[in-house]
Amino acid sequence: MNIKPEEITSIIRQQIENFNTNIETIDSGTIIQIGDGIARVYGLEDCMEGELIEFPNDVYGMALNLEQDNVGCVLLGSEEGIKEGNVVKRTKKVVEVPVGEALVGRVVNSLGMPIDGKGPVLTTETRDVEVPAPGVIDRQSVKEPLQTGIKAIDSMIPIGKGQRELIIGDRQTGKTAIAMDTILNQKGKDVICIYVAIGQKQSTVAHIVNDLTKMGAMDYTIVVSSTASDSAPLQYLAPYAGCSMGEYFMHKGKDVLIVYDDLSKHAVAYRTMSLLLRRPPGREAYPGDVFYLHSRLLERSARLSEKLGGGSLTALPIVETLAGDVTAYIPTNVISITDGQIFLESELFNAGQRPAVNAGISVSRVGGNAQIKAMKQVAGTLRLELAQYRELAAFSQFGSDLDKESVKRLEKGKRLVEILKQPQYSPMPVEKEIIILYAAVSNHLIDIPVNKIKEFEKELFNYIDTHYRDIGKDILEHKQLTDELKSKLDKAINDFKNVFLSEI
């Protein structure tokens, strides 16, 4: 075989020209221990706290413990097939989730991956899961109401856009029901809703999604689900992921409502992770930074200043108590972080008062500024009258003779309690709430039998819709009860009452 020197030269020249000098440096480490969803990695000298680490089998982990000689990572997937000695790589990114309009109407997991079988989420935008909360200058005060459609809450414990209002109570007292009704009441109000399920049963989440779909609420709702079968790190990430999805819309100038259901299970997931990472336990075996865990999440809810678009993120965190004990660690922490709490009692629930709101210890610390004037006018004395009724009711059980004034108060109180009862999935427009509460507070219902109150309420709305349609419009337009409007309301209620009483 005859090879010419020129050919050899041209081949060598060609190879030199095509030689690629790109050198890629990969910061890698070695797994020295793995188990219980926790991996200890040797190496990764320049690793960041909260950084994504790439493990074999397309599994990612999150670096949480940066120690002197190793890095403690939590796995965001199955540890199957991963063993000691495997090489892991840094990604130089922190955990982020997809955000955008494409998520609305979808059910996703803590990492923003769809789990509803409707195909991929078509969005290119992402946002870090952990973002600093807006500063004092970037916020404005809460001044616009977020109507829940629940009479007891909108009147006595009003919620404003940008507020954090805790829903707290024992299991099976209707905490999720209040959050669901609030989501349903946002229909047609241009509010994006996000429901974050943390550590719930899959059947419960499926039931909630089914109900939201049936009521047409999935058109403006995102469900972030991290069920009981998910690992602790995924349950830990879920609320932060949901919050990032909400912040995207908030920075676009929109109003967002986010429900965290529930933060007790979130704290348990964080406790599991912390103990496995060998962090020292504190009270109730929770780590020392469990307060910061929830404060940095809830502080991200805000009403942004007009300069930043004026969007808002309203949070309804849910916390479960054991036997009504609000002095436990997590309940006291979250109560001190939020701007008020709605306390639900199992005794009231079992007595048939639903929603089972205890008006005595439930408060809204900033929502009063957001209430419309008409609601303030009718609800001003409501809390006091209910408190007096409870005191009198307890006193009257001893069978003592009561004077006329006390009997009158008792009868009025019974009717107020009856008016505040409301079935699930039936949120009420604010103008109707004002009409019926006005009727109750102004002694119009005193001669209606207690067992006929619900029937009276339903038929009164039908009567006003037919004969006095402009009353509702006037309330919404003026946002206050003028003397003229009051006399019109009195006339409408009295006209209907005469018809109603004649038919009983």
From Swiss-Prot:
- Pfam families for this protein: ATP-synt_ab, ATP-synt_ab_C, ATP-synt_ab_N
- Which sites bind ATP? 169-176
According to its UniProt entry, the protein's GO biological process terms are: proton motive force-driven ATP synthesis
Summarizing the function annotation, the protein's role is: Produces ATP from ADP in the presence of a proton gradient across the membrane. The alpha chain is a regulatory subunit.
User: Quaternary state and partners of this protein?
Assistant: F-type ATPases have 2 components, CF(1) - the catalytic core - and CF(0) - the membrane proton channel. CF(1) has five subunits: alpha(3), beta(3), gamma(1), delta(1), epsilon(1). CF(0) has three main subunits: a(1), b(2) and c(9-12). The alpha and beta chains form an alternating ring which encloses part of the gamma chain. CF(1) is attached to CF(0) by a central stalk formed by the gamma and epsilon chains, while a peripheral stalk is formed by the delta and b chains.
Q: Which family does it belong to?
A: Belongs to the ATPase alpha/beta chains family.
**Record key words, sorted:** ATP synthesis, ATP-binding, Cell membrane, CF(1), Hydrogen ion transport, Ion transport, Membrane, Nucleotide-binding, Translocase, Transport
Q: What name does the UniProt record give this protein?
A: ATP synthase subunit alpha
State the organism named in the record: Clostridium botulinum (strain Hall / ATCC 3502 / NCTC 13319 / Type A)
Per its record, the protein catalyses: ATP + H2O + 4 H(+)(in) = ADP + phosphate + 5 H(+)(out)
The answer to keyword Flavoprotein applying to this record is: no
- Per the UniProt record, which EC number(s) apply here? 7.1.2.2
The superkingdom listed in its UniProt entry is Bacteria
**Covalent S-S links between cysteines:** none
Q: Which Gene3D superfamilies match?
A: 2.40.30.20, ATP synthase alpha/beta chain, C-terminal domain, P-loop containing nucleotide triphosphate hydrolases
The protein's location, in the record's own words, is:
Cell membrane
Question: Looking at the keywords, is Nucleotide-binding present?
Answer: yes
| Recorded topology in the membrane | Peripheral membrane protein
Instruction: Supply the InterPro entries for this chain.
Output: ATP_synth_asu-like_sf (IPR023366), ATP_synth_asu_C (IPR000793), ATP_synth_asu_C_sf (IPR038376), ATP_synth_F1_a_nt-bd_dom (IPR033732), ATP_synth_F1_asu (IPR005294), ATPase_a/bsu_AS (IPR020003), ATPase_F1/V1/A1_a/bsu_N (IPR004100), ATPase_F1/V1/A1_a/bsu_N_sf (IPR036121)
Which residues are marked as site: Required for activity?
362
